[in-house]
Amino acid sequence: MNNRYKLFSLLLVLTLQLTGCGQQPIGEVQAFSPNATIGQSGQQTQQTTQQAQQTQVQSLRVAADYESIVASPWNCEDLNSRKAAMLLYDSPVKLTTTFDSQPALVTVSGSGTQWTLTVREGVLFSDGSQLTAQDVDDSLTMAMAEGSYYRNQLTNIASHSVSGNTVQVTLNTADALFANLLTFPVAKLSGGSYVGTGRYRLSTQGEDSVTLSRNTAYWGEAASIEQIELVSLEKKDVAVYSLKLGNIDCLYIEGASSDIANLSASSYPVVSNQLLFLGANPNRTATANAAVRQAISKALDRSYLIETSLSTSAQPSNLPVHPDFSLLSTPSVETRDLQTAQQLLTDAGLTGEGTSLSLTLLYSTGGADRAQTANQIAAQLSEAGITVTLDGRAQEEYFAALESGSYDLYLGEILLGDDMDLSHLWTQGERYGYGVQPSQELLTAYQTAFSTGEGWDSFAQLFMQEYPLIPLAFRNGTFCFSREFSLDVLAVRSDLFYNIDSWQTQN
């Protein structure tokens, strides 16, 4: 049996703001902090509820600032307020847990760089006016504007315009899954604030809270909860304690956090395309060798790494494509194989009689689980004959070391696009893209898959021959509820309330 390693950790190559807001670039500077059932996806959590006796919840208190939401749902200042905005507003499409887009306010058609958004007819805003293509186009403009939380996912759009009941979109480069990015809120300015077409509408407004009631004119399935109370918290940094004290009923937390482990709350994993990985220095002899990177991947027990090191739930993966992605059939979790790992290193002449391999692992000391993860990786690699020296640095020093190439391996975390845009992994930008460059063959396979939607399995097979980076896992977000609520929740990062039409208490 393999020895079990007992150290903890995880890294993110990002700056995390627990309840922060504003623009979040797709790169190694994101926001995080949850805890949920280890390794479970939202679908796995839901499968155990089929035979449970269920009763309906009448109301729910959600941490959110109503005024900032209706002032601009695209760039409000608080993470949970942005998520709660999707109760009042709809997005053009809905994204499933398998990264498939479903028509909502629009039906998307097209291919390559040319796309048509056909607007659903008969949809009403809460002020009684009808949704038009101009409303969708205006909302797209707002979502692309400076300061919008959605700006970075829409930078590939070259132009967009209204034509009858459609919005015509031209992209800079072909993207087969462009529709996956259309998850921004659609809103219309009415009476000095933005109204929506969503599942709820304003009912009453008090000094510290706002009550929303079900939208009786909603075009889709009615929500199961009759009313939602939006509770404005004076201090955003005490949101976790507000949940613990019962001042709110639910809270979304993104990324690594020590707070969740101390919460007496039920929690649900939120599917997110947030990749944890090891990067390799292309200018060091050992890590520039693809066989060494293959050996490192083979030497890792990713499931145990998640179990012992992460402060959140996650899904193990040795590929940079999410395990739930519907267009990928290649298994994304390889079994740990120390014997093969050792043989690869021996064949490369790096281990064996009289020789050993020593590597440094750079990681950022910020965050709740980075040091634990780095330590656990070092413990696992030591069993394959690799001696790892840990180099933990504060964030700015960490990035300086990456810029100067002062590392063999580095621990990174990045939020990838829901359209499976992997370019930030190997195209260097501000605080992302460090490490080995893929071969032209691998890049061509990726571009084919990304632009056409076909060939993801071919890309996966080529990727495992090179491992320009070594994926570890995809971190889930966490949707926390007070113990009073045990609901049938299925959530995705773009819509925490994805199946609120079927939320019921499980007795």
Specify the residue positions occupied by each region the protein language model found.
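Extracellular/periplasmic solute-recognition and catalytic clefts
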Residues: 159-161, 203-211, 229-284
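A bilobed periplasmic-binding-protein/Venus flytrap-type ligand-binding module shared by bacterial periplasmic
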Residues: 213-217, 267-295, 299, 308, ...
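Extracytoplasmic/peripheral linker and loop segments enriched in polar/acidic and small residues
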Residues: 49, 390-398, 423-486, 506-507
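N-terminal lobe/hinge region of extracytoplasmic solute-binding protein
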Residues: 63-111, 118, 141
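Gly/Pro-rich hinge or "lid" segments in bacterial periplasmic/extracellular proteins
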Residues: 78, 170-229, 235-238, 343
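Ligand/substrate-recognition segments at binding pockets and active sites
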Residues: 348-416
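Append "and occasionally in soluble cytosolic enzymes with long acidic Gly/Pro-rich linkers
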Residues: 288-379
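Aromatic- and charge-enriched surface segment that lines or borders ligand/interaction sites
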Residues: 106-147, 286
